[in-house]
Amino acid sequence: MIILAIESSCDETGVGIAELGDDGSVTLLADEVASSVDEHARFGGVVPEIASRAHLEALGPTMRRALATAGVDKPDVVAATIGPGLAGALLVGVAAAKAYAAAWQVPFYAVNHLGGHLAADVFDHGPLPESIGLLVSGGHTHLLHVRSLGEPIIELGSTVDDAAGEAYDKIARLLGLGYPGGRVLDELAREGDPKAITFPRGMTGPRDEPYAFSFSGLKTAVARYVESHPEASQADVAAGFQEAVADVLTAKAVRAAGDLGVSTLLIAGGVAANSRLRELAAQRCEAAGMTLRIPRPRLCTDNGAMIASFAAHLIAAGAAPSPLDAASDPGLPVVQGQVA
């Protein structure tokens, strides 16, 4: 079965094509992405209207490239990100997917963007066993229990304020690194000393929720430090901030795995491309005797391939197609894999 999927939840226009085998295997055939990030940079963040217009312009060419790369004329299924994400951006991708499904007379599947991030890893590491999922991106930070990609996902905890990726972007702007700041801040942090400045670790007290996160206090602490220490090394500030984020994320994820008796940790989402998060997670998983799975950096950011993968797993588990009147949901919860 050939599955074509469209991703348009934010500022990347993605079209992915995957093949679902009779044995349940999922093979990537094409992964084409067009980004409008440069159009948003001068505004210091994503502008929803610009994102929507960029999707309209990029979707056709991106679709043609994906079909050509995969050598496919017509898929057996069309899927699309139905949420969460920017309302206008979602509408563009969902409307296009429905139109393609109707024109090709094939089933339509409306699937969760966040589940797609988890499913992207399958292309690098094969079938996913029961796992603790740490999903970290610009808009989301969740700790999840993933029994399988075809079953409902259980949320163990999430951020009570800022997402980890949002904190990265805000600190990058504070340091004058521009937008998007995650990659640039990561590079700067590698030049600094993570022990030079110790920043607070939110939600780590004995009375705090063990699987919840908070990054607003860290963000404020960094801002106050920079204001009161104008002579401080930017690299040291970046390293100290990055260490605090990676420390909390990995500590809580490994703890959850131990509490639930799960031996695999999956880290997914845009922040999963961060070098220190990957490094510290590897160290802690090795110490705990756990298996760590993180997709290659390209598959950590938004793309259509991950949506194709998640749709494939839902189909393999027996999910019925979504109706063509299924509405996009900007606030779709992570526990709802599909809008049926």
From Swiss-Prot:
Substrate binds at residues 135-139, 169, 182, 186, 274. Required for the formation of a threonylcarbamoyl group on adenosine at position 37 (t(6)A37) in tRNAs that read codons beginning with adenine. Is involved in the transfer of the threonylcarbamoyl moiety of threonylcarbamoyl-AMP (TC-AMP) to the N6 group of A37, together with TsaE and TsaB. TsaD likely plays a direct catalytic role in this reaction. Its main location: cytoplasm. Its EC number is 2.3.1.234. The gene is tsaD. Its cofactor is Fe(2+). Keywords: Acyltransferase, Cytoplasm, Iron, Metal-binding, Transferase, tRNA processing. GO terms for cellular component: cytoplasm. It comes from the Bacteria. It is an enzyme of class 2 (transferase). This is tRNA N6-adenosine threonylcarbamoyltransferase.
